[in-house]
Amino acid sequence: MANDQKVRVGGRELNVSNLDKVLYPATGTTKADVMRYYQAVADVLVPQVRRRPVTRKRWPEGVDRQSFFRKDLEDSAPEWIPTATIQHTTSVNVYPLIDGSATLAWLSQVAAIELHTPQWRFGEDGAPRNPDRLVLDLDPGPGVALRDTAEVALWCREILEDMGLTCVPVTSGS
């Protein structure tokens, strides 16, 4: 790998490369910047995704180039990345699980910029548990301002909090 380095993150050693590769050309944001961002948000992000299988959307040459989705754990992944297996209708996939900042650092190393997780987690026994979150995907349609969508989100929050549920806003940026 070009510009190989070993870094220590979250108590783990990780091989990284091409940290100066620009992943967001419009802003000049590099792989190292994405890695720093993932580390900055780890304390908030990890509890939300812990023990959830993660499908990754990767942009190895930057967001202005071809992307692809990846379910199975990459062959090059460090052995310390926790995994879980899901039997789908036509295939068996071994997914990585995010358990800390080191896994997030590895995800940034492979340019996994979008992280997709289901509404459920694996239990300590390795079996899928019941869903533990609800996602309301609010997208403004034609002629609808983002401000209107935000107002609907506030109404949803009020209703859900009245039901005793904890609300966590998430934006995708798309």
Model-predicted segments: where are they?
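Generic non-transmembrane alpha-helical segments
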Residues: 155-163
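A short linear hydrophobic-aromatic micro-motif
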Residues: 164-169
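SsDNA-processing nucleotidyl-transfer enzymes
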Residues: 2-13, 35, 40-142, 146, ...
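Acidic, metal-coordinating catalytic segment for phosphate/diphosphate chemistry
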Residues: 15-27
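Hydrophobic/aromatic-lined pockets within catalytic cores
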Residues: 24, 46, 50, 161
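Short, structural beta-strand-to-alpha-helix junction motif
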Residues: 30-33
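Short, conserved phosphate-binding/catalytic loop or strand-edge motifs used
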Residues: 171-174
